[in-house]
Amino acid sequence: MVSIRPDEISSIIRQQIEQYDQQVKVENVGTVLQVGDGIARVYGLEKVMASELLEFEDGTVGIALNLEEDNVGVVLMGEGRDLEEGSTVRSTGRVAQVPVGEGAIGRVVDALVRPIDGKGEIHSTETRLLESPAPGIVQRKSVYEPMQTGITAIDAMIPIGRGQRELIIGDRQTGKTAVAIDTILNQKGSGVICVYVAIGQKASTVAQVVNVLRERGALEYTIVVAANASDPAALQYLAPYTGATLAEYFMYKGKATLVVYDDLSKQAQAYRQMSLLLRRPPGREAYPGDVFYLHSRLLERAAKLSPELGEGSMTALPVVETQAGDVSAYIPTNVISITDGQIFLSSDLFNAGLRPAINAGISVSRVGSAAQIKAMKQVAGKLKLELAQFDELQAFAQFASDLDKATQNQLARGQRLRELLKQPQYSPIPVEEQVALIYAGTNGYLDEIPTDKVTSFTAGFREYLHNSQPKYGELVRSEKKLGDEAEGLLKSALNDYKKTFLAMA
C-alpha cells in the first residue's frame, strides 16, 4: 500500500499557489437576438458608444448605429454568414478608425483601408477617426489658389479653387466620371495628392479607372478607395468618410489634396437601405431624416486651412446622378445647397456630340473666380458673354428665315467657340494653352476656319505654339497673366499657323 506523504502534498500545493497568476478580464458582452439583411439586433451590451465597433464570435465586425432601450442595432461590415441567434458579441471600446499615411498612395483599398490590389500589406503607424470634426471658421482661409482641371470649359467658365467643393451632376452616361478622372490626370507634377472614392460601382468599372490612372502615371499620387456594388451597404456608407480621412492626413501636413466621391447618390441609397432595415422612420423619397447631415458633415471637411495650420487644402468633387435631368430631386438639391457650385452635364449636349457635355447656363462656381489666374480672367469674360449671346440667338434663329450679316457672324463665331470647347477624354490641356485657344476664338482668328476643321486647327496650333514659341508658355506660367510680350508672341504664332493651315486646307 502506497503511503501518503503529507509534506510532498503540501509542497505541491505551495508550488501551485506560487505559480497561480490571477487575471481578471472584464468584457462588455452581448447576445445576438436576430440577424439578417446585414443587420443584427444585440441584447445585453451596456455602455456602448454610438458608431462603436463591435466584434462577433466569427470575426465579423459591425458598427453600433441604433442604441435603443433594450437592444442595439448593429450594421455588419462583412458577410456574417456564420452568425446565428445566441451568438456572442463583444464591444471593442473603439469608434471606427482607419490607418492613414504615405503607404496608402498608389494603392487600391476597401472602405477600411484593407488592400484589395494584391500588392501586400499597407504599413502604417498612424490611425485617424473616420468621423472627424470639420475645420472651424478661424481654422480656414478663403479659397484663392486654382485647382486646374485641364478641361477648358471648366477652367474658363466654372473655375475651381483649392479647398472648394464643386458638384458634378448629370444623368447616367453623360461623362461625370470622365471629368473627375481628367482632373486627377491634370494634377501630375503639381504635388496634389488625389483620392478617388468609388461607391457602389461595378468592380469592372473600378478596374477600368485604375488601369487608366496606372497607364497615365497618375496612380503614383492617387489612392483609390473602392466599395463595390457587391460589398455590404455599411462599407458603401463608410467609403466616402474613409476617402476624406485619408486626404485629411495630408491636408493637415500642409499638402493640397483632391477627393472625388463617385457617387454620393449610391451612398445615400446604401444609407437609406441600412436605416429602413434598422426601422428608422422614412422621410421624403424614403430617405431617413438625417440624410442631409450625412452629406453635409462629409463635404464640410473640405477646406483651405489657415497659415497657422500649414495652409493645406482638401478640394472635394462630389458626383451625383440625376434621373432624366431632374435636379430638383431630394439628393441633388441637398448636395447643391451644401457645395460651392455645380457642373451640370446634359445628356442632350452629350448626344449632340458636345463633349464634355457641360451646360454652361446652369453650371456655376460660387468661389472659384477668386482662384482663376489673371491670364484666364482676361480671356474668359468675353468667352462667357459670346456663348450666352450665341445660345439666345440660336434659339431665335430656328424660327427666323433671313438673318442680317451681324447675326450670321455672331452665330458662326458661337459655333466655332462651341467646337473649341470640345475635348477628347483623358487629355487635359495646360492652362497657358487654354488661354491661347480662347484668345484665338474670341478675337476672330477662327472665323475663317470651317467649323468642322476647328478641332484639327486647335490640336495642330497647340503643337505649333509649343514648338515655335516656347517662351509664351514660360511667360504665362511665371507671370500668371497675358502680358504684352506674351500676347505679341501668341498673335504672331496664330497668324503664322493660320496662314499655313488655310493654305493646306
UniProtKB/Swiss-Prot annotation:
Disulfide pattern: none
E.C. number: 7.1.2.2
Keyword DNA damage: no
Catalytic activity: ATP + H2O + 4 H(+)(in) = ADP + phosphate + 5 H(+)(out)
GO cellular component: plasma membrane-derived thylakoid membrane; proton-transporting ATP synthase complex
Subunit structure: F-type ATPases have 2 components, CF(1) - the catalytic core - and CF(0) - the membrane proton channel. CF(1) has five subunits: alpha(3), beta(3), gamma(1), delta(1), epsilon(1). CF(0) has four main subunits: a, b, b' and c.
Similarity comment: family membership: Belongs to the ATPase alpha/beta chains family.
HAMAP family given in the database record: ATP_synth_alpha_bact
Descriptive protein name: ATP synthase subunit alpha
Organism: Cyanothece sp. (strain PCC 7425 / ATCC 29141)
Name of the gene this protein is made from: atpA
